Swiss-Prot record:
It catalyses: 2-C-methyl-D-erythritol 4-phosphate + NADP(+) = 1-deoxy-D-xylulose 5-phosphate + NADPH + H(+). Its EC number is 1.1.1.267. It comes from the Bacteria. GO terms for biological process: isopentenyl diphosphate biosynthetic process, methylerythritol 4-phosphate pathway involved in terpenoid biosynthetic process. Keywords: Isoprene biosynthesis, Manganese, Metal-binding, NADP, Oxidoreductase. 1-deoxy-D-xylulose 5-phosphate binds at K125, S151, E152, S179, H202, S215, N220, K221, E224. InterPro entries: DXP_reductoisomerase, DXP_reductoisomerase_C, DXP_reductoisomerase_N, DXPR_C, DXPR_C_sf, NAD(P)-bd_dom_sf. It comes from Cupriavidus taiwanensis (strain DSM 17343 / BCRC 17206 / CCUG 44338 / CIP 107171 / LMG 19424 / R1). Mn(2+) binds at D150, E152, E224. Pathway: Isoprenoid biosynthesis; isopentenyl diphosphate biosynthesis via DXP pathway; isopentenyl diphosphate from 1-deoxy-D-xylulose 5-phosphate: step 1/6. This is 1-deoxy-D-xylulose 5-phosphate reductoisomerase. NADPH binds at T10, G11, S12, I13, R37, Q38, N124, E126, G208.
Length: 393
C-alpha cells in the first residue's frame, strides 16, 4: 500500500488525485490531506478516505474540522499552520507527496518533502519558479524523486530519454504547448473589459480561478517556461511555446536528428496524476481514451506577445535570473488577486508585473531567505500598483 499526502486536497488537482486513489483502493491510501479554507469539503474527504492526519490554515478552521470529524466518528488527527504543513510533507509514514497548493504558500512544504527524500509529485509551480536552484539542490542532496504533474512538463518528461530526462543527449528544443486560453482570437482592444468570470471560463481544462486567469494572460505558460528550465536543464533559447487550441498534444521534444516526440491525450489532469503515482508503471486513470478520428485537425501557431505580454515578461525574468522569477510570481499573484476582487482591469495585471520587475532590486536566489525577502518586497510594490490603478479607474 502506497501512502499519499496531498497538499491542497480540496483544489482541482487534489480532487483529481483522490479520484485516482479511489479507483485503486488496494494500491493507494490517503495518509494526510490539507486545505486552507474549505473545511467542509476537507471534512467530507476525511470521512471518505480516513487519512491519519489533516491540516488546515487557522486555529478556527481546525476547531471546525475537529467538530465535523468528531460528529462523524472519524479519528483523523487535525492540526493547522505552516509548520503542520511541513510536518505532513515530511511525515515518515508518507511514501509520496502531491504538492498542489497554489501560489507561494506551497513553497515551504514542497521543499520540506524534497528534503525528506520523498517522491514529490510536483503540481505547485512556485517551488521551481521562486527557488529553482534551491529546490533542485534539495532533490539531489536528499535523494528525492521529482515527477512533474503539470500536463506539459509531464509530457516532456515522457518524451525525454527515460534514463536521464534532461536537456542534452541529442535534444534540440523543448516545445511547450498552450491552449491560448479563452481570448486567443479576441480583439486585443477589448481585453480591458474582461470580467473575472470570463477569464475563468477556460475552453478545455477545469482549473481553479487563479490558474484560469493565469491561463488567460498566458502567465501560466510563462511560469511553465521557468519550470521547464529547472526541471530539464534547458536554456531559455531552447524552450519554445506553441499555441495549440485543441489541448491534445500536451508538449513535445525536438531532437537534433529531426525527430519530434509528442505526448497526446484528452485534456484531463488525472492522466499525469496517475502517471506520477504509478511511475514507472501505468494504471487506469479513469480518463476517456483519445480518439484521433473524432479530434479532427490539430493546429499550432506562435503566440502573439502583444496580446499576451505576460509570456514575454516570464522569459525576461528567466533570462535575468536571480530573484527575478520570484518577483515576477509575487507581482502576478497580487495582480490576479486584485483582478478577481474587481479592483483592477484584466489588462492591468501585466502592467503591474512589468512595473514591479523593472523597479525591484536584483540579487542572487541562493538562500530561501533571499527569495522570500524578494517575494515580500515585490508584493508590497505590486499592492501599491494595484492601489494606484484602482484609484485611476
Amino acid at each position: 500500500m502506497h501512502r499519499i499526502t496531498i497538499l491542497g486536497a480540496t483544489g482541482s488537482i487534489g480532487e483529481s488525485t483522490l479520484d485516482v486513489i479511489r479507483r485503486h483502493p488496494g494500491r493507494y491510501a490517503a495518509h494526510a490531506l490539507s486545505a486552507h479554507r474549505q473545511v467542509r469539503k476537507l471534512a467530507d474527504q476525511c470521512i471518505e478516505f480516513r487519512p491519519a492526519r489533516a491540516v488546515v490554515g487557522t486555529a478556527e478552521a481546525a476547531r471546525e474540522l475537529e467538530t465535523l470529524l468528531r460528529d462523524a466518528s472519524v479519528a483523523t488527527e487535525v492540526s493547522y499552520g505552516e509548520a503542520a504543513l511541513e510536518s505532513i510533507a515530511a511525515d515518515a509514514q508518507t511514501d509520496a507527496v502531491m504538492a498542489a497548493i497554489v501560489g507561494a504558500a506551497g513553497l515551504r512544504p514542497t521543499l520540506a518533502a524534497a528534503r525528506a527524500g520523498k517522491r514529490v509529485l510536483l503540481a505547485n509551480k512556485e517551488a521551481l519558479v521562486m527557488s529553482g536552484r534551491i529546490f533542485m539542490d534539495a532533490v539531489r542532496e536528499h535523494g528525492a524523486t521529482l515527477l512533474p504533474i503539470d500536463s506539459e512538463h509531464n509530457a516532456i518528461f515522457q518524451c525525454l530519454p527515460a534514463d536521464d530526462p534532461r536537456y542534452g543527449r541529442g535534444v534540440a528544443k523543448v516545445l511547450l504547448t498552450a491552449s491560448g486560453g479563452p481570448f486567443r482570437t479576441r480583439d486585443p482592444a477589448t481585453l480591458h473589459d474582461i470580467s473575472p468570470d470570463q477569464a475563468c471560463a477556460h475552453p478545455n481544462w477545469v482549473m481553479g480561478r487563479k490558474i484560469s486567469v493565469d491561463s488567460a494572460t498566458m502567465m501560466n505558460k510563462g511560469l511553465e517556461v521557468i519550470e521547464a528550465h529547472w526541471l530539464f536543464g534547458a536554456p531559455a533559447e531552447r524552450i519554445e511555446v506553441l499555441i495549440h487550441p485543441q489541448s491534445i498534444v500536451h508538449s513535445m521534444v525536438a531532437y537534433t536528428d529531426g525527430s519530434v516526440l509528442a505526448q497526446l491525450g484528452n485534456p484531463d489532469m488525472r492522466t499525469p496524476i496517475a502517471y506520477g503515482l504509478a511511475y514507472p508503471e501505468r494504471i487506469d486513470a479513469g480518463v476517456t481514451p483519445l480518439d484521433l478520428t473524432l479530434a479532427g485537425g490539430l493546429h499550432f501557431e506562435k503566440p502573439d506577445l502583444a496580446r499576451f505580454p505576460c509570456l514575454g515578461l516570464a522569459f525576461d525574468a528567466l533570462r535575468a535570473a536571480g530573484v527575478a522569477p520570484a518577483v515576477l510570481n509575487a507581482a502576478n499573484e497580487v495582480g490576479v488577486e486584485a483582478f478577481l476582487a474587481g479592483q483592477v482591469r484584466f489588462t492591468d495585471i501585466a502592467g503591474i508585473v512589468r512595473q514591479v520587475l523593472e523597479e525591484a532590486p536584483s540579487g542572487p536566489a541562493d538562500t530561501l531567505e533571499a527569495v522570500l525577502a524578494a517575494d515580500a518586497l515585490a508584493r508590497e510594490a505590486a499592492r501599491a500598483g494595484v492601489t494606484a490603478r484602482a484609484a485611476a479607474r
